[in-house]
Amino acid sequence: MTQRIIGLTGGIATGKTTVANYLASAHNLPIFDADIYARDAVSLGSPILDAIARRYGKEILLPDGSLNRPKLGEMIFQNQDQRHWVESLIHPYVRDRFLKAIAESTSPILVLVIPLLIEVQMTNLVTEIWVVICSESQQLQRLMERNHLTLEQAQARINSQLSLKEKAAIADVVLDNSSSLDALLKQVDIALNFEL
C-alpha cells in the first residue's frame, strides 16, 4: 500500500493546529510541522539566523541573541521583497526536514502541516491536500485575538498568503471550520476514512 501523505494547509488562524492536534491525539498520526522546522532554522547560532542578523542588524535579535520574531514579522509582512528573501533562506531547510521525515517514517499515513504549502510549491511532497477554511471575518478576528495584532497587522499577514478561496480550489479535501469544533472534527474523520 502506498503511503498517504496529507498536506494540511489553510490560511493563518483558520484551525490547522486544531486539526493537526486531533489527527495526532484521536488517530495517532505522526505530525510534521513546517512552523517548528522554520523555528529550528533560525535557532541560536544557526547560519540562517546569522544571515538575518547580518542583513537587518543586531536590533533584530533579542538580548539573548535569539531572533526577535515579532520584529522580523513586522518588517517582512510589510515588504514583499524582504519576506521573499527570508523565505528563500528558510524554505529549503524546511523542505529538507520534511524529506528526511518522510524517508524515515514507516507510518502508512503522515501529516505535513505546511501553512504555505501551495505558495512555496511544496505540493509535490504530499499525496493529498487538505485545506482548513473559515469565513474571512472569523479568520481576521481569530488572528487579532491569538497574536494580539491590530486590524492592519492582521490584514497584512492574511494578504501575504493565497486567499482561502484560491487554496480551496486546489484542495482534495476542504475542511470548513466556520461552525462548531464537533462539525470540524466530523469532517476530519470522514476525510481520513476516504482514500483519494
Curated annotation (Swiss-Prot):
Q: Does the record's keyword annotation contain ATP-binding?
A: yes
* Binding-site list for ATP: 13-18
Domain DPCK as annotated: residue spans: 5-196
Alphabetical UniProt keywords? ATP-binding, Coenzyme A biosynthesis, Cytoplasm, Kinase, Nucleotide-binding, Transferase
Q: Report the PROSITE patterns cross-referenced here.
A: DPCK
Give the E.C. number(s): 2.7.1.24
GO cellular component labels: cytoplasm
Biological process terms from the Gene Ontology for this record are: coenzyme A biosynthetic process
Q: What GO annotations for molecular function exist for this entry?
A: ATP binding; dephospho-CoA kinase activity
> Which pathway does the UniProt entry assign to this protein?
Cofactor biosynthesis; coenzyme A biosynthesis; CoA from (R)-pantothenate: step 5/5
Q: Where in the cell is it found?
A: Cytoplasm
Class of the enzyme per the UniProt entry, highest EC level? transferase
Query: In terms of one coarse class, where is the protein primarily found?
Result: cytoplasm
This enzyme catalyses:
3'-dephospho-CoA + ATP = ADP + CoA + H(+)
Q: What does this protein do?
A: Catalyzes the phosphorylation of the 3'-hydroxyl group of dephosphocoenzyme A to form coenzyme A.
Q: Which family does it belong to?
A: Belongs to the CoaE family.
Q: What is this protein called?
A: Dephospho-CoA kinase
Query: What is the scientific name of the source organism?
Result: Nostoc sp. (strain PCC 7120 / SAG 25.82 / UTEX 2576)
